[in-house]
């Protein structure tokens, strides 16, 4: 069996409200998370909502990292989807924790593109 991608979904509760509404801080957190997991950054795009909330994505050569925040609830939803053997999506978690300071994190692991090795054409 071969796995084409690793996908973790993060549910972050009890985050610092100011961090969840800090667009430049979220951009930096995304860049730091990309470096931590060993991925290759293509670009980062974020959007600040009114009256509050930020959404953002780091586009990677290996896929993406995304975030959507609800400061009024102290909540953020994140996806870290990577392809390739050299990228470690779980290594993003300490960078995310350092910035958002969640009280609780739920992590869901999804194996993407499970195929039989003999199905892979060289």
Swiss-Prot record:
One Pfam family recorded for the sequence: AdoMet_dc
Modified residues (Pyruvic acid (Ser)): 63
Record-linked SUPFAM superfamilies: S-adenosylmethionine decarboxylase
Domain of life per record: Archaea
Gene3D superfamilies documented for this protein: 3.30.160.750, S-adenosylmethionine decarboxylase domain (3.30.360.110)
Cellular compartments per GO CC: cytosol
Job description of the protein: Catalyzes the decarboxylation of S-adenosylmethionine to S-adenosylmethioninamine (dcAdoMet), the propylamine donor required for the synthesis of the polyamines spermine and spermidine from the diamine putrescine.
Protein's name according to its UniProt entry: S-adenosylmethionine decarboxylase proenzyme
Originating organism: Methanococcus maripaludis (strain C7 / ATCC BAA-1331)
Biological classification of the source: Archaea, Methanobacteriati, Methanobacteriota, Methanomada group, Methanococci
């Amino acid at each position: 069996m071969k796995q084409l991608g690793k996908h973790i979904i993060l549910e972050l509760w009890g985050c610092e409200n100011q961090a969840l509404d800090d667009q430049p801080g979220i951009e930096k957190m995304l860049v730091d998370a990309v470096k931590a997991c060993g991925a290759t950054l293509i670009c980062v795009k974020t959007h600040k909502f009114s009256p509050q909330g930020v959404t953002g994505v780091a586009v990677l050569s290996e896929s993406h990292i995304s975030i959507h925040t609800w400061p009024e609830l102290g909540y953020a939803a994140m996806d870290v989807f990577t392809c390739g053997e050299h990228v470690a999506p779980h290594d993003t978690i300490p960078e995310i924790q350092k910035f958002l300071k969640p009280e609780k994190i739920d992590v869901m692991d999804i194996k993407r593109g499970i195929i039989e090795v003999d199905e892979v054409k060289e």
